Amino acid sequence: EKGQPDREPMPKADIRKMLFPLGPVVVFGASNFPLAFSTAGGDTASALAAGCPVIVKSHPMHSGTGELVSSAIIKAAEKTGMPNGVFSNLNSRGIEVGQQLVKHPKVKAVGFTGSLYGGMALYKLANERDEPIPVFAEMGSINPVVIFPSAIEDDGSLWANKYASSITMGAGQFCTNPGLVLGIKGEQLDAFAKTLSQEILKLEPTSMLHPNIYGKYNEGKNDLSGQDGVTVIADYTKETSANVARPAILKVSGAKFLANPKLHKEVFGPFSVIVSCKDSAELEEILNNLEGQLTGTVLGNEKDLATYASVVDALQSRVGRILFNGVPTGVEVCSSMVHGGPFPASTDARFTSVGTSAIKRWVRPVSFQDWPNKFLPKALQNENPLGIVRLEEGRYTN
């Protein structure tokens, strides 16, 4: 915004704004994604793109992979002339190293992918500092799927097949795993539940990434299976090798689901709960009682979007990404992707951990007012020596 010294009744100052890196960022590697959400994952890539040096606290369950990837990053940094220390990787099994990193006064932000317990522990620690810093934590989700009768009538078998694959993909170790299916009570939903159960039991179970995830999965599955009013409609019972997760599908009424908050919690693995709602009003009530989620999906047709508009609105209010006639497990890396959501899916629903917008987590805006042109950052100088796209007087230019 260029200055207007002759403006009446008051002169307008020359004000120019750009983004600057926050400073050193600590990234905690995810246990379920040794590559895409770990040492060289989206947090690291976006922080480096923002101009921030990165310290990775490697996950102990894949420290060897972390070391290999770290070596590649350091070689790339040297090859491209990046400053020494722009990236480092630390290994430890305990929590002390991570705690000290978050508390260090030169660290300015934290990226985390993992459990609600772990994310909130870091969030609390960061806010207890003399200078609190942001913690961008992605902490999981049950990713509700609303299936309307029309979807079952038109393509019930197709959706059962697709969701059997989605629920079991990667042994269910996706944070976008569809762990909750909501439908309206009736023969159609019963038929869908039966077909989904049959399809999921046809698939060969696969190994989970490490014993800790496997143990937590079985603990959560067994806990929910024993809750009041819950029926286990699919349970893989054949013999498997160590750490192989047996898929399971549960079914429960809408009333029982509403009355039991335990059923709203994530079970991380090849697992999903089908909720039989007495009508669309109860379905909407359930959505309004859910915590924040990464994704929500609608299976139906365009007429359903109008007929059940309030249901769709309730779902949208709870999620960072809402899908129509798809499965949520794929996350495209692009500028329009939102991988985040209202708490506790993430600590700040305004940001994403996937896509180019993830960079915005690691920067802060600075305005320069009435600054001499030659002393401005090149990105703000009149001549635009960098040739970048800029917003000038409300219009994009380059």
Named regions from a protein language model:
Residues 2-164, 182-189:
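Rossmann-like NAD(P) dinucleotide-binding subdomain of oxidoreductase/dehydrogenase enzymes
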Residues 101-106, 149-155, 221-222, 246-248, ...:
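Short, surface-exposed amphipathic charged segments that create phosphate/polyanion-binding patches used
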Residues 173-175:
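Extended low-complexity, polyampholyte segments enriched in Ser/Thr/Pro and acidic residues
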Residues 183-294:
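NAD(P)-dependent aldehyde/semialdehyde dehydrogenase
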Residues 240-243, 280, 285-376:
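C-terminal core of ALDH-fold dehydrogenases
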Residues 365-398:
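Structural signal for terminal/edge beta-strands and the immediately following C-terminal loop/tail
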